[in-house]
């Protein structure tokens, strides 16, 4: 159900547009079909390996690896959230996971001899894709997210990949500036929008060609399904991504797609509470002497704040900081009562982890990535401060 173009400016305030459509209204109605008497508002999942197809094969639904009506509803919904004002009609392609979505963009648009520019401080699995690209004969260049450092590597590039805010360091780059420079150099631009979600940042409006995300995290927000998606500026780009999905079979199950669509209805409510919780937590952590390296784009003193405030509509649910050493960090995590020691982020239940336990990220042993959930703010902040007090006692 297309419900108009949005020019609102805040998840927290439920930003709207010229016809009065706010983020919450859009999220609740996104992707719904026109009402049909005696049918549910959101049709249930369609489980089908093949579809009845007499005669010539016409229409989108032929075989379950190609298309599914449950995907269609979800894809339309995400496109409405990612690019409500896109005049040419953005298209979304959903995948079995975020890594499947990332791989689809990179591997469908880069071939031997091409140049791809990646961040060197992005998601932990991105180096695996770098290795695969290089094995295929693609030249990969890397630079940090901060300071728009990737600008210096665009000569001859085929594709520029941005991750902003970066995970787990929370650096931010100027998407519009980088996109303009990349397009001038003849490169396509993809932005990993996982941390911001479509309500916090709209990469296509900032000039990107692709907005890519793991829907496992903030988009669906319950920590109970894996999903990825790519929203493309136009049909031609989407066709290449969709073809790659068909080739490798990286499709979401109908149940996962349906659960994801159902979860979108609460996206604005979840995002607003979680973003507010993250900022309150960051402000409380700023007063703690044992905390160093505190990062959250919403803090006025954060190095990324000025850039983030110019392109983000809210600042996300993640806070990162460093405690004195590994033992101190582990004591802190063990002392928390309202926060699960778990990886990933974006869920309604707060999680935190010592990120260095995985290896691969250039972080200190005491580095904590904290994902603020939807708990009452005073309860969450009190639990974290109590945990810090216990950890400090040794």
Where are these regions (language model features)?
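Short loop segments at secondary-structure junctions
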Residues: 50-51, 232-237, 264, 322-327
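PLP-dependent enzyme catalytic core of the Aspartate aminotransferase-like
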Residues: 2, 86, 130, 140-141, ...
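A common structural junction motif
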Residues: 248-249, 336-346, 387-394
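C-terminal core of ALDH-fold dehydrogenases
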Residues: 27-42, 327-360, 366
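Conserved PLP-enzyme active-site core in the AAT-like
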Residues: 29, 81, 86-290, 295
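Conserved small-domain helix->loop->beta segment predominantly found in fold-type I
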Residues: 279-337, 354-363
């Amino acid at each position: 159900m297309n419900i108009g173009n949005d020019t609102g400016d805040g998840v927290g305030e439920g930003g709207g547009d010229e016809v009065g459509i706010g983020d919450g209204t859009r999220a609740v109605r996104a992707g719904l079909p026109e009402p049909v008497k005696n049918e549910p508002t959101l049709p249930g999942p369609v489980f089908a390996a093949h579809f009845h197809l007499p005669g010539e094969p016409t229409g989108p639904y032929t075989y379950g690896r190609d298309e599914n009506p449950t995907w269609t509803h979800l894809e339309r919904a995400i496109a409405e959230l990612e690019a409500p004002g896109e005049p040419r009609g953005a298209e979304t392609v959903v995948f079995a996971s975020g890594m499947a979505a990332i791989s689809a963009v990179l591997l469908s648009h880069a071939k031997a001899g091409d140049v791809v520019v990646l961040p060197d401080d992005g998601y932990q699995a991105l180096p695996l894709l770098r290795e695969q690209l290089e094995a295929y004969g693609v030249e990969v260049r890397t630079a940090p997210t901060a300071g728009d450092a990737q600008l210096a590597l665009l000569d001859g590039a085929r594709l520029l990949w941005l991750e902003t805010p970066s995970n787990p360091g929370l650096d931010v780059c100027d998407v519009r500036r980088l996109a303009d420079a990349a397009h001038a150099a003849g490169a396509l631009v993809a932005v990993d929008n996982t941390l911001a979600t479509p309500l916090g940042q709209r990469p296509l409006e900032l000039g990107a060609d692709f907005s890519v995300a793991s829907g496992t995290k903030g988009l669906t927000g319950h920590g109970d399904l894996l999903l990825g998606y790519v929203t493309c500026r136009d049909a031609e780009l989407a066709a290449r991504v969709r073809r790659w999905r068909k080739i490798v079979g990286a499709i979401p199950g109908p149940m996962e797609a349906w659960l994801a669509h159902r979860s979108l209805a609460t996206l604005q409510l979840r995002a607003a509470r979680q973003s507010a919780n993250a900022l309150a937590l960051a402000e409380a952590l700023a007063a703690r002497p044992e905390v160093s390296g505190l990062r959250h784009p919403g803090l006025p003193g954060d190095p990324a704040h000025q850039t983030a405030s110019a392109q983000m509509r809210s600042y996300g649910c993640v806070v990162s900081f460093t405690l004195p050493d590994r033992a101190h960090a582990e004591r802190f995590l063990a002392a928390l009562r309202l926060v699960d020691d778990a990886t990933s982020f974006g869920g309604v239940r707060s999680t935190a982890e010592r990120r260095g336990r995985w290896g691969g990220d250039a972080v200190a042993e005491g580095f904590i990535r904290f994902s603020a959930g939807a708990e009452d703010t005073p309860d969450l902040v009190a639990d974290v401060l109590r945990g810090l007090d216990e950890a400090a006692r040794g």
